[in-house]
Each structure stands twice: as structure tokens, then as C-alpha cells.
Amino acid sequence: KMEAAVADMLKDIDADAFILDCMPNPSPEEITERTQYLVNTIRKYHQGTPIIMIETYMRENGYSDQAVHDRCTRQGEAFVKQYELLKKQGIKDLYLIRDNHAIGTDHEGSVDGTHPNDLGFDRMVEQYQPQIMRILKKYGIK
């Protein structure tokens, strides 16, 4: 959920890249409140290290439950807005991977309408891996 304590812990981790795939759990309001601190803390202690933000995927039950659909949409909008603000502030080496129905729309990619099953995770890998690898390649990371 991008708590400040997690951001403070990440500053001490020596990583080649940071992939932020934490959007399914925080509310849109928490995303707005916490994203800046998380990214700015990572950037302060890890200059030149890529930070890859992954937009939340639409939960399968969001296709039939308007409240879930609206929450997922607002989460994504809040995350993209924070990304854009960070870029305007001049944060370097920051990337955004947008959702493109990551777990599918056929209701086969989830165990419960929310959590991906093996097929859902496989679909996420198919969508995210090529994008992540292109970013990492820019930094000589294989």
C-alpha cells in the first residue's frame, strides 16, 4: 500500500531496478497521498536506478460490478496522474507501464474475480515482461 515505512526501508536496498506493482490494494486517495513520497525516497537514495510503475489491472469482477470498476478506474487515474506529476518535477529514470487487460477479459484469468490464477499471471508476464526488459536493457540489465 506504499506506506512511508516501506519507502524508508527500500532506501537501504541495493537493487538494479525498482518495480512498483502495488496498485491493487491502496485506495485512489492513498495512491495520491503516498506515491510521491515512495518514488522521491527511492530516487533520493538510488539516483540513476530505473523505477518502473505498473498501473493496476481491471479486476475481472469489475466488468460486472460497477463499484469495483469505478474503484479500479480511479486507482489507475490516480497512479497515472502521480506519474505525470513526478515527470513534471523532473524525476529521471521513471517509467509507467499501462494496463491493457493484463489478466484478460474472458473471466479465466482469476480465481475469484480479483486475484490472478496461473493463467492470469501468465498473461501478466506476456504483457509486462517485454516492456520491462526494454527498459532494463537501456541500463545494461539482462
Report residues per predicted region:
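Aromatic/hydrophobic pocket-lining residues that form the small-molecule binding cavity
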Residues: I31, T35, F79, F121
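Oxyanion-hole/transition-state-stabilizing segment in secreted/luminal serine hydrolases
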Residues: M2-Y45, T56-Y63
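Substrate-gating cap/lid alpha-helix
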Residues: N61-R98, R123, K142
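Loop/turn elements at helix/coil->beta-strand transitions in domains of secreted/extracellular proteins
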Residues: D14-F18, Q47-I51, I91-L94
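Active-site segments of SGNH/GDSL-like serine hydrolases
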Residues: R43-R74, I97-D106
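The substrate-binding groove and active-site-proximal loops of carbohydrate-active enzymes
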Residues: D21-E30, Q66-T73, V111-L119
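Sec-exported extracytoplasmic/periplasmic mature domains
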Residues: N40-Q47, E84, Q129, M133, ...
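Histidine-centered active-site loop/cap adjacent to the catalytic His
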Residues: D112-K142
